[in-house]
Structure formats: structure tokens, C-alpha cells
A protein has these predicted regions:
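Formylglycine-dependent sulfatase
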Residues: 1-182
Length: 182
């Protein structure tokens, strides 16, 4: 498959080094920038400093945005965790599903608005494996899951589904799969 979709200026990255925690590493991996240049120098809380906004900067272009512009289909499955996720006043009630909020973060920061055609996964970094709080499909919250739901299996199934759909298309695809641990 690599030969079939090899662009004229193919680049293979052999190494990726980053000493940060999960969100800063994700931001760096997706943008090719140092975490603070991507806007997530610490975690997904806004520290009111340019490099520590808690979400990707507008000028930090994601690999999905670049590949989409080059004609690729782009999909993401799994843990996003690079959008500012402010604490709600009723956070504990929300986590226990006793109250419901429509958005988990600014939707402009969701994967489908940062270069990914498709997204199935969680916006927050925390996840209950059996009933994840911030589960979305595209940018629509998934409020109910089956009783036998297990997020790792669901993410794997979704990734396989995307690969099967993309592989039958006439253009190359990029799939970013990010499981929830850690």
C-alpha cells in the first residue's frame, strides 16, 4: 500500500522524541512543533500564557490538515485530549452522568475541525472504559453505549471500519489511532 500512495516527495520519520506528558506529546506529534509552540505547554487548562492556552493554536497546522489538503482522506479514532477542557461547576455530577452538557470543549478545537474528515473517540483525557463521558462521533456527543461496551474494543472496531472504507477509495488515507491509556 505504501508504494501505491507514495507521493513524489515522500518523507519517512524514523524517530520521534518528546519528554512531555500526554497532551503536550499529542500536540507535538500532530503538529511537529514543540508543545508550547502548539499551545499546549502543560495540559489542557488555559494558563493565560501564549504557549499554555490548553488547546492547539490556530497557526499550529496538524498533519491531518496538511494531508487533507494534499488529497488524503483523514480519520482519527481514540483520545483527542488537546482541546481546552475547563472544569464545570458541576463536574462531579457531570462525570457521574447526573447532568448533561452539549459540548466537552470548543467545537472549533474538535478533530473534525482540525483536518480530520472522521472522528470517533473522546475529547477529554479521562475515560471510563465502559461508559466514557466525552465520547463523540464527528462532533456529536454519543450519550448512550451498549451494556457490553468496552472502549478499547470500540476504538479498534472503528479504526478497522475506517481502514476498510478508506482502502476502497481512489485516494490515499491517513488514520491516527490513539488509545485511551495513557
Amino acid at each position: 500500500m505504501e508504494e501505491k500512495f507514495r507521493p513524489p516527495t515522500w518523507i519517512r520519520f524514523n524517530s520521534f522524541y518528546n519528554a512531555s506528558r500526554s497532551c503536550p506529546t499529542r500536540a507535538s506529534l500532530l503538529t511537529g512543533l514543540y508543545p508550547h509552540q502548539a499551545g499546549i505547554g502543560r495540559m489542557t487548562f488555559n494558563d493565560n500564557l501564549p504557549g499554555y492556552r490548553g488547546q492547539l493554536t490556530e497557526n499550529g497546522v496538524t498533519i491531518a490538515e496538511v494531508l487533507k489538503e494534499a488529497g488524503y482522506q483523514t480519520g482519527m479514532v481514540g483520545k483527542w485530549h488537546i482541546a481546552e477542557t475547563p472544569l464545570k461547576s458541576d463536574q462531579r455530577e457531570w462525570l457521574a452522568h447526573h447532568v448533561y452538557h452539549e459540548d466537552f470543549a470548543d467545537k472549533a478545537c474538535y478533530p473534525v475541525n482540525r483536518g480530520f474528515d472522521d472522528f470517533y473517540g473522546i475529547i477529554y483525557g479521562v475515560a471510563n472504559y465502559f461508559d466514557p463521558l466525552s465520547l463523540v462521533n464527528g462532533d456529536i456527543p454519543v450519550r448512550n453505549v451498549p451494556k457490553d461496551y468496552y472502549i478499547t474494543r470500540a476504538l479498534s472496531d472503528s479504526a478497522v471500519s475506517y481502514v476498510n472504507r478508506y482502502a476502497n477509495a481512489d485516494k490515499p488515507f491517513f488514520l491516527y489511532l490513539s488509545y485511551t491509556a495513557p
